[in-house]
């Protein structure tokens, strides 16, 4: 992500971090963390996700140490070396690095003003047998495109028909 250079923004970030640390259990922060997140982590995640996922429950939440670790785990579980994952034609560079390291092929779906092509995804499902669809639907990195609701629904319908898991990297969806 871009590094802030505005002194006022940096001061607010420093003050916020100091406020968090002032009330934190430092020993808990320095020890190994609970696998999948602490109950407090999961409660915070449920609070964050509930506006979009009203039935969200802490028992179905897995907290990870960052997107790279989570993507590496997901990609390694869904695809083996030489297998394929569909992505937007311009996709998150971190995913490219992970796929390269794991030997997974990324198949680029062409983009238009609404997002990745649904017809291209359907054709890929029929002919290439992808193991997953990775998408970054809100402020697609690096294009800043937001995928339309109708396109999201079309992609989801295709994924359901072909039993293709979707990895939705939607860090900005709540903004």
For the regions a language model picked out, list residue spans one by one.
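N-terminal "arm"/small-domain region of PLP-dependent enzymes with the aminotransferase-like
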Residues: 1-36, 40
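Conserved core of the PLP fold type I
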Residues: 27-163, 167, 173-175
């Amino acid at each position: 992500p871009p590094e802030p250079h505005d002194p006022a923004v940096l001061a607010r970030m420093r003050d916020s971090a100091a406020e968090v640390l002032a009330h934190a259990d430092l020993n808990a922060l320095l020890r190994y963390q609970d696998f999948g997140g602490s109950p407090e982590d999961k409660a915070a995640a449920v609070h964050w996700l509930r506006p979009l996922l009203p039935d969200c429950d802490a028992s179905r939440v897995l907290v990870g140490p960052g997107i790279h670790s989570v993507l590496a785990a997901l990609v390694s579980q869904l695809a083996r070396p030489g297998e394929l994952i569909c992505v937007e034609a311009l996709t998150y560079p971190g995913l490219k690095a992970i796929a390269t390291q794991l030997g997974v092929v990324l198949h680029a779906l062409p983009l238009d003003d609404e997002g990745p092509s649904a017809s291209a995804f359907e054709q890929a499902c029929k002919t290439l047998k992808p193991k997953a669809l990775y998408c970054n639907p809100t402020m697609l990195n690096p294009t800043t495109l937001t995928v339309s609701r109708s396109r999201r629904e079309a992609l989801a319908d295709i994924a359901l028909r072909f039993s293709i898991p979707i990895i939705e990297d939607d860090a900005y969806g709540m903004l």
